[in-house]
């Protein structure tokens, strides 16, 4: 699409969830240099796993993958995140991480003003050229 319209930008609406998911997987497969990914919620379900595998395959091809997740929705995912972050071409960062990993509610009780700041971004960018943005998080 970019090659067909050099020097121009454009917008294309992805109205169906399946189309939006497929577009993300295709972008991950087509990326040559970078993938910059930000999500408020990333479920560890079928869709989340398939998209994670697409990011992992891209990293295996030498693509630099940067994943930013809001920590509010990562409860129970620390081992999954650590394994992903161990890949040399993948960086995982948590937005506004909780200090008490196992007792997150404690942070809400003692530090509400800080932990209530959340990142609701939903963005999937390949090679700084194509971006999918919008209201869809990752999950079934």
Indicate residue ranges for each PLM-predicted region.
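HKD-type phospholipase D/PLD-like phosphodiesterase module
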Residues: 3-31, 41-140
């Amino acid at each position: 699409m970019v090659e067909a319209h050099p020097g121009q930008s454009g917008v294309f609406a992805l109205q169906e969830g399946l189309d939006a998911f497929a577009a993300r997987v295709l972008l991950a497969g087509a990326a040559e240099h970078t993938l910059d990914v930000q999500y408020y919620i990333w479920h560890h379900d079928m869709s989340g796993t398939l998209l994670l595998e697409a990011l992992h395959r891209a990293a295996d091809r030498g693509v630099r993958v940067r994943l930013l997740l809001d920590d509010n929705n990562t409860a129970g995912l620390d081992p999954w995140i650590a394994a992903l972050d161990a890949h040399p071409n993948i960086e995982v960062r948590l937005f506004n991480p909780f200090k008490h990993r196992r007792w997150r509610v404690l942070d809400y009780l003692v530090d509400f003003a800080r932990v209530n700041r959340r990142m609701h971004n939903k963005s999937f960018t390949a090679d700084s050229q194509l971006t999918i943005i919008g209201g869809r998080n990752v999950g079934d």
